Amino acid sequence: MAKKNIKQKKDNRIAIDVKKHIKKVDVGVFGGTFVFTSPLSIAELAPKLNKSTNEIIMRYFKKGVVYNLNTILDEEQIGELCLEYDLDFKIEKNVNTENLLENIAFDDLEADLVARAPIVTIMGHVDHGKTTLLDTIRKSSVTASEAGGITQHIGAYQILKGDKPITFIDTPGHEAFTEMRARGANLTDIVILVVAADDGIKMQTEEAIDHAKAANVPIIVFVNKMDKYEANPDKVLNQLSAKEIVAEELGGDIVFVKGSALKNEGIFELLDSILLIAELNDYKANPNRLAYGTTIEANLDKGHGPLATLLVQNGTLRKGDYLVVGSTYGKIRNMFDEYDNEIEMALPSKPVKVSGFEEVPTAGDKFLALADEKQARAIANDVKQKKIRLERSMLQSSDIRAKIANGELKNINLIIKADVQGSLEALKGIFNSINIEGVTTTLVRSAIGTISESDVRLAQTSDAIIIGFNVRANRIIKDLADSVGVQIMNYDIIYKFKEDLEAWMKGTLDPIIVEEVIGEAKVLKLFKHSQVGTICGCRVINGKIKRNALVRVLRDGIVIYNSKIATLQHNKDSVNEVIADKECGLTIANFNDVKENDIIEVYVKVEKNHDEVK
């Protein structure tokens, strides 16, 4: 039987010309403009400006600043120096395979561009209803499955309003996820700022405003929870006006939509506002090229291995494409939409879940589809080598280990395993947010996946605590950890981990010795004794006094001697303590120069942890 000829459909998508994007900047003066790439030492800068090093050093010396050949001048200083020499200046960037993905520049013709869905990021304070709003829009709910009612990682979804698609990115509201919210703002075309009408603006509201302004994107305010009795939308409008987010009804240019995500009120008006802004801004992309975009989320999936949620920002992504994503690469084996339906392709602004990577990508990494696997592997390897060099450089430049070794710092070693990259980032970010003098944390290992035998062995040798966030160790691994004395701590709520880490860090500090006054006695009469010296006849005026307790002798409010009680009697009997309003006789070790009306302050030294000391 004759074989059928199966024709492969020709792929007409444009591939990035990697060589064309590689650029090495020539540093120097060209046509009255000094072109440079980064901070330079005076020794490096002078010949490029056609000046002597002495001339530049003397310029600063005359300003009262002493520099030498090795002094590094930053970009601003170089710019100022250029202006003094009547030169314009321009900062350019060297582009190589190590930083190619962050420096892709498309030269698409206007005729090749088509309208794409707006990318909308929902931001706002924790518990103000962002996820509920997105759930209402999607007609589904994931809120109940999120521990503590806080969205633990970014989700990206595309919906239809009529026949027009809108892509939504949901960002976590908790303080630990600042980096993820910043990433969401930088990916987006429009920010939806959700503010609860019964609560007003809060910390993350202000942070979201800052991110949106930094990204220079339009803002729509959704005043949520209007169904609440305590709702006060005017308060919200006034608070936001003070932050230069002025509603149209108050003479500004910001669209405000009032409603209730829970009651499905104001949703259609919100969607219409998004589409209106999208139409005005005319968002476009070229679907006829290999895809480029950003990794939204990544995790290790039991069924599919390394899995990443990708947002296509330009081009079309197809099943079977070769991808480089940060320091990893792969060939797309499976592609799923936001509802886990397997699909063959994704157009611009489409979020998809993709499998087929060699390793779990890092959330926030750019991705690029390439014509062949060899090229993808080579670029990924170059990026990986750059990361290794940076890590080694940071380790070598840090003096933390030396301080730990000589006792200047206390240290906690941690191994963190998490279910998804976004959560891992947030946990790592907590280290930067906690600052307790004298204590540091060392992250021995951080990775996505379950807790393994190698984690336990590493924890054993490095004296580390293993943190599992939404991942667990199986019984065999738990038994191994118990047998070698390794502690495994499991979490599913980010702020619980933060609380515990703070407690551990404070717990590693040496206890603070605090003096606590337990009693006072007033000297009423003095008796001289040939063997024991001066006996003080006292009345306890406050608290109690104890034999062998530490004392301060105060005269007119001034401490004149520190010692301890040598003997203590009550009614001629030796006793261990005497309470308030009772009289006693006592002697003070090695001190006889006591006078009537002196106050004997009795105190003890107590060890306290740092939380107890205010």
UniProtKB/Swiss-Prot annotation:
Residues 224-227 are annotated as: G4. Residues 149-153 are annotated as: G2. It comes from the Bacteria. Residues 124-131 are annotated as: G1. GTP binds at residues 124-131, 170-174, 224-227. The keyword Protein biosynthesis applies. One of its GO terms (cellular component) is cytosol. GO terms for molecular function: GTP binding; GTPase activity; translation initiation factor activity. It is found in: Cytoplasm. The keyword 4Fe-4S does not apply. This is Translation initiation factor IF-2. The gene is infB.
